[in-house]
Amino acid sequence: MHVKKGDKVQVISGKDKGKQGVILAAFPKKNRVIVEGVNIVKKHAKPSQANPQGGIIEKEAPIHVSKVMPLDPKTGEPTRIGYKIVDGKKVRYAKKSGEILDK
């Protein structure tokens, strides 16, 4: 998968097109990610210890990974990702600026 938890991304298609956010969780086996503030759904929750009131809560639902594009750390624009070997480690880099994404 070309994105990881903590990456800043932009949604490139769907009802939330153009929104930016940070990846909160990634599910590589399902090819889906949860992005902060994107794809908000209303969920009916039973009363529980954490939520004694119950009722309807809004939370982020997973979206397909092909709908998000990482943001270039230098320019802040969406960019494609490439891979290269640096000091014997495989790292991701932004195709637009050449900036390395992995610390």
Swiss-Prot record:
Gene3D superfamilies linked: 2.30.30.30
GO MF annotations, alphabetized: rRNA binding; structural constituent of ribosome
Any single Pfam family the record assigns to this protein: KOW
UniProtKB keywords: Ribonucleoprotein, Ribosomal protein, RNA-binding, rRNA-binding
GO cellular component entries: ribonucleoprotein complex; ribosome
Alphabetical list of InterPro entries matching this protein: KOW, Rib_uL2_dom2, Ribosomal_uL24, Ribosomal_uL24_CS, Ribosomal_uL24_KOW, Translation_prot_SH3-like_sf
Ribosomal protein keyword on record: yes
CDD domains according to UniProt: KOW_RPL26
Gene Ontology biological process: translation
SUPFAM superfamilies assigned to the protein according to its UniProt record, in alphabetical order: Translation proteins SH3-like domain
Binding partners and assembly: Part of the 50S ribosomal subunit.
PANTHER family reported for this sequence: MITOCHONDRIAL RIBOSOMAL PROTEIN L24 (PTHR12903)
Family to which this protein belongs: Belongs to the universal ribosomal protein uL24 family.
Role of this protein: One of two assembly initiator proteins, it binds directly to the 5'-end of the 23S rRNA, where it nucleates assembly of the 50S subunit. One of the proteins that surrounds the polypeptide exit tunnel on the outside of the subunit.
Protein name: Large ribosomal subunit protein uL24
Organism of derivation: Geobacillus stearothermophilus
Lineage: Bacteria, Bacillati, Bacillota, Bacilli, Bacillales
Gene of this entry: rplX
